[in-house]
From Swiss-Prot:
This is Ribosomal protein L11 methyltransferase. Its EC number is 2.1.1.-. Methylates ribosomal protein L11. It comes from Alteromonas mediterranea (strain DSM 17117 / CIP 110805 / LMG 28347 / Deep ecotype). The keyword Manganese does not apply. S-adenosyl-L-methionine binds at T145, G166, D188, N229. NCBIfam families: prmA (TIGR00406). It is found in: Cytoplasm. It holds the Pfam family PrmA. It catalyses: L-lysyl-[protein] + 3 S-adenosyl-L-methionine = N(6),N(6),N(6)-trimethyl-L-lysyl-[protein] + 3 S-adenosyl-L-homocysteine + 3 H(+). Keywords: Cytoplasm, Methyltransferase, S-adenosyl-L-methionine, Transferase.
Length: 292
């Protein structure tokens, strides 16, 4: 089935209203896209974050009466009769197959590979984590995840106890287990993330060495390795919580940090952590070290 895609640029103040109008006029799906490639930071619980310049995208059936729809949209105060838009056809494709074709096994460091389940692993003797894009949040494609995975690949994980703070999809937890960790505890504020982590662990055959908890439910422990790939705001707010998970001489790795935020993170953690030189990938950074 062919589709028409309508793109409208607006501000964050009006983006949801524009999206509601598209839905009311027959859009089968509405998405919000950053119009100017602006970094987005961690929202507060219950808060919906939109970019200052937001592009609202509506998907319409090919036979939709777009002339009438555009006329109705132009009567809305938040748009006005001279609003700017882009209307373009989307050719009929096997979108699922095209989506799958875009993902390939990725290598991090010397040993570690992240592989979609529908692909053959390039090296059966390597450390292979099977993880499908779309099941949850991190799949190795974002620089913050890649920075942590490359760090993990260089660590002797044999017999280690690990905390993955803000585990998301569980990609870092799974990598640690596949690299030889004895036990990993995943912590996240989102129950869906915990469910995704458990499911991904089951798919990789390591569920018996993984426990997951909401922050308020996690038992006290001191781990050999603590990983926190979240964002700088929570890293600063939760500095004492994160460092307390780490035993003396244990290892800590932090990411989700913009390069310009490194000094602030290092200042917050330097009292408790002997810091290594930070690593940079594009606009993102990794901070790591060992507990005093």
């Amino acid at each position: 089935m062919a589709w028409l895609q309508l793109r409208i640029n607006t501000s964050s103040e009006y983006a949801e209203s524009v999206g509601d109008m598209l839905s009311a006029n027959g859009s089968q799906a509405v998405t919000y896209v950053d119009a100017k490639d602006t970094p987005m930071y961690e929202p507060k619980p219950g808060e919906i974050m939109l970019w200052p310049d937001t592009q609202v995208v509506g998907l319409f059936e090919a036979d939709a009466d777009m002339k009438s729809i555009l006329q109705r949209l132009g009567k809305a105060k938040v748009l006005g009769p001279d609003f700017k838009y882009k209307l373009e056809p989307l050719e009929d494709k096997d979108w699922e197959r095209e989506w799958m074709d875009n993902f390939h096994p990725m290598q991090f460091g010397e040993r570690l590979w992240i592989c979609p389940s529908w692909r053959d692993v390039p090296d059966p003797d390597a450390v292979n984590v099977m993880l499908d894009p779309g099941l949850a949040f991190g799949t190795g494609t974002h620089p913050t995840t890649a920075l942590c995975l490359r760090w993990l690949d260089g660590i002797d994980m044999a017999g280690k106890t690990v905390v993955d703070f803000g585990c998301g999809s569980g990609i870092l937890a799974l990598a640690a287990l596949k690299l030889g960790a004895e036990r990993v505890v995943g912590v996240d504020i989102d129950p869906q993330a915990l469910q995704a982590t458990k499911e991904n662990a089951r798919r990789n055959g390591v569920e018996d060495r993984l426990d997951v908890y909401l922050p308020q439910d996690q038992p006290e422990l001191e781990a050999d390795v603590v990983m926190a790939n979240i964002l700088s705001g929570p890293l600063l707010e939760l500095q004492s919580v994160i460092t307390n998970y780490c035993k003396s001489k244990g290892l800590l790795v932090l990411s989700g940090i913009l390069a310009e935020q490194v000094s602030k993170i290092e200042d917050a953690y330097s009292q408790d952590i002997v810091l290594e030189p930070s690593a940079i990938d594009g606009e993102w950074a990794r901070v790591s070290g060992s507990k005093r």
